[in-house]
Structure formats: structure tokens, C-alpha cells
């Protein structure tokens, strides 16, 4: 088996390829960016364009991790070009190379403002272009699989927010605030957040290489979901501080402060780490469920251990000159 990892120079792709390298799996990467870890196996390519490439090893599986998902993507048409047109180009390449297995990372963003406990059968109601184009990309892959249902395998993984060492997304920003000692808890802290550790996501993608023909769709969440109180206390304890949260800001006051920063930002053009939407996101519940256990998959790293690994790497050990990934 030879795997082509499309978008393999990124955060999840790098972690996945490290697993492949560790366990002796053959792989190549297509990416518009150079891989700091595996430059020797990278083929430069952009999923927005037809992928006519010469491979040193003919792939038997495609894993597509390429995506546009930052909140500030401009022009907005990039979401469609990368997520939807990119899916079409991947499927065209699969047809040309007679590849019968595609693994695609979608997102729980397709559910939009989902009810607590939304699973794979949840209502599709994306509220932004990222979620909408991820859903549209899923339909492109389903069409490809429907052309030869007896032989083609499609795996769609919908992770919640992915965190881990080297990532500079929303979870890192929260951990950095806590580590700075300037973190202020807003609200009662009882709200829960579903999260996914990058090593576990990579392990699931690797595990799904053995799935049989058909369509396999799974949310991915590391359980159990922890409350903000538990998360903040755990991080403080790891940093050698008291786990007690001594002061809390009422949600209404936190929202007022966030709105004030929004006004100042609008007037001055400056960006601030506090905003009304960030206060709302922090205090909101975001809980998803998954049927992944039915496959027999067991995540290699428990959630609390994953948080510990991330905190140690980012705020205790010295990795300041190493590569990081900006994803959100």
C-alpha cells in the first residue's frame, strides 16, 4: 500500500506522515508548501488546479487534508476553490490513477450551531463558507464513490477543533492565556467543549486505511468532554500553580468588555485578543458525539494526557525555534 497525502505539509498531515514513517508505510505528499519534516517526498501541487503528477510510487490510497479554514480567508471564493474544486480535482486524479480509496477530512462545521450531542446523523446547517464548502466537498466524494460502489471506499472524518503541539489555533490561544497568568474566567465554567488531539486524529486516519468498500462517515471527538473549569484547573496544575479558580467575571460583564474592545478595534483598526464573539465562544457549549467506537478504534492518547503533552511542549520545554502551524 502506498498513500498519497494531499496537504501533507500541514499540521495534521505532518503528524500523520510521522506515524507512517515510524511504522514503515510508503507515502508521498502533495502540497503547495514545503514539508519541513519530509522534503524529499513532497510533490509541489495545488488542489485548485488539475493534478497531473508523476509519482515515484504509484499510490493506492488518497488522503485529502488540504483545506481553507481560517476565519479571515479572502477572497471568500478560496473556500470553494480549495474545498470543492479541490475535491473534484482529487477525484479526477483518483479516476486517472485507478485509485479506489479516498479518505477526506471534513469538519463538524457542517452542522453549524449544532444541538448538544450532535452525531453523524445531525442536521446539516453550516453557518459559514468553510462549513458549507466542506459539506459540498463531501457530495463530490460521494458521487465518485457511487460510480463503483463495489470497489470504491470513501472515508469521511469530521473532527471537532483539533489541537496539539506546534498548532497555533484557538485551543493554543486559550492555553497561552492561561499560561501567561493573565487569564480571567468568564462565566461559571460549566460549559463543555469537544476537542480532538492531533495524534489521535492521525491515528484514526491511519486506522481507516483498512476500511472496506462503501461510505464510512464519522465525527471525531476525544472523550470525555471536559468543562472549562476542569480544563483551566488542569493546565494551572501542570504549570505548578493552584488549580483553584479564585475569581470569575460574570458573562454579561465579559460580553460588555468584549463589545467595548470591538468598538475600539473598529475605530483604531487594531486587533485585540478579546472580542464579543470570543467571549460568546468561550462560554458556549460545543459537544458532539461519534460512532467511531463501533469500528474498534481506540485513540492512543487520553484527552487529559494530550492536554498535558501540549502544555509541556509549548510552555515548559524549549521549542521556540521549531516549526509551528497556523490553522485558525
Each language-model region and where it sits:
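Flexible, glycine-rich beta-alpha linker
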Residues: 111-112, 152-172
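Mid/C-terminal beta-alpha module of Rossmann-like enzyme folds, strongest
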Residues: 208-273, 301-328
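NAD(P)H-binding glycine-rich loop region in Rossmannoid oxidoreductase-like domains
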Residues: 46-85, 89, 93, 111
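N-terminal Rossmann NAD(P)H-binding glycine-rich loop of SDR-like oxidoreductase domains
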Residues: 3-23
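Glycine-rich NAD(P)-binding loop of the Rossmann-fold in SDR/ketoreductase-type enzymes
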Residues: 78-89, 124, 132-135, 196
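Conserved Rossmann-fold NAD(P)-dependent oxidoreductase catalytic core, especially the SDR/UDP-sugar
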Residues: 89-129
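Substrate-positioning beta->alpha
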Residues: 167-173, 187-209, 216, 230
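Active-site Tyr-X1-5-Lys
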Residues: 128-155
